[in-house]
């Protein structure tokens, strides 16, 4: 079976689980955190979680993992990992801020995916790029932002390679309610030709009687919405999220590798926060 790389199988398994751990930590840590007058500069913890995620958007098969979940919060002036996600802050004002943000997708083995049988494996991707955040409104216990992330994507193969770009603007609402920190966001997605091709192209040599050749185009890539909740009780941190994705009407929807028009992703985790810095920093609204 052809693959994108020649990493030994035990290493591939470790890579898949490591990528899944990072993805789950990013989704959950970026969900919401409580606001206080001042907070610890950093916090460390470790827990356990479960994650269900599609092999790729438009796939009718899912990964199901039980994973260790690292809890890492850092509230520095430039580098931060908190309720806004993991990023490097480039500009920070009351209404507008600009940061360098991260994203990614999990790996998938073609032998585990019926639609991709005999095709190259999908490596995990790392997405990185600028994100412009515009504060639209704020009140007691809530805030509404428009977030505009534009990211370059890199496939984590033996020799990492660029696989294009993604743009996924979202409206993001954060709410504090009875000790819970709730987040809701959603918006459309767009991607370049190389990004869509990595996931959805079928070359002439990969075509079969039930899988026609297909060349992806750039453009509209569907939409997604995520809801999440977290709560801190003493040194315990509980978090969960649910995401809905749709590729209906997307330029990639006619690929034979798209076997359903919508996907759901969800995860829950419980972590024990075992170390907190003595240094304190003011909360950033």
Locations of the language-model features?
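Outer-membrane beta-barrel translocator domains and adjoining extracellular loop/strand segments
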Residues: 57-62, 111-116, 157-164, 195-203, ...
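Outer-envelope beta-barrel architecture signal
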Residues: 38-44, 64-66, 77-79, 92-98, ...
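Predominantly the C-terminal beta-signal and adjacent terminal strand-loop region
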Residues: 228-285
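Residues on the lipid-exposed face of transmembrane beta-strands in outer-membrane beta-barrel proteins
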Residues: 48-52, 68-74, 85-90, 128-134, ...
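Outer-membrane beta-barrel transmembrane domain signature
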Residues: 158-237, 245-248
């Amino acid at each position: 079976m052809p693959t994108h790389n020649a990493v030994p199988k035990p290493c591939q398994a470790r890579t898949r689980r490591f990528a899944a751990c990072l993805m789950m930590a990013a989704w959950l840590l970026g969900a919401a955190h409580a606001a206080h007058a001042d907070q610890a500069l950093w916090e460390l913890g470790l827990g356990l979680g479960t994650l269900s995620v599609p092999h790729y958007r438009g796939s009718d098969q899912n990964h199901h993992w039980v994973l260790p979940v690292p809890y890492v919060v850092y509230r520095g002036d430039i580098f931060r990992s908190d309720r806004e996600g993991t990023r490097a802050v480039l500009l920070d004002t009351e209404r507008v801020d600009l940061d360098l943000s991260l994203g990614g997708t999990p790996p998938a083995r073609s032998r585990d995916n019926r639609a991709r049988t005999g095709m190259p494996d999908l490596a995990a991707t790392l997405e990185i790029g600028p994100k412009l955040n515009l504060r639209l409104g704020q009140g007691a216990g809530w805030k509404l932002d428009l977030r505009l992330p534009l990211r370059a994507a890199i496939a984590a193969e033996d020799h990492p390679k660029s696989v294009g770009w993604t743009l996924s603007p979202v409206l993001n609402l954060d709410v504090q309610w009875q000790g819970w920190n709730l987040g809701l966001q959603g918006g459309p997605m767009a991607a370049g030709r190389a990004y869509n091709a990595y996931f959805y192209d079928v070359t002439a040599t990969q075509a079969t009687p039930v899988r026609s050749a297909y060349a992806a185009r750039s453009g509209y890539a569907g939409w997604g919405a995520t809801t999440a909740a977290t709560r801190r009780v003493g040194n315990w941190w509980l978090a969960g999220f649910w995401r809905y994705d749709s590729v209906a009407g997307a330029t990639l929807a006619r690929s034979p590798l798209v076997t359903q028009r919508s996907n759901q992703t969800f995860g829950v985790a419980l972590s024990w926060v075992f170390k907190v810095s003595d240094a304190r920093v003011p909360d950033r609204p």
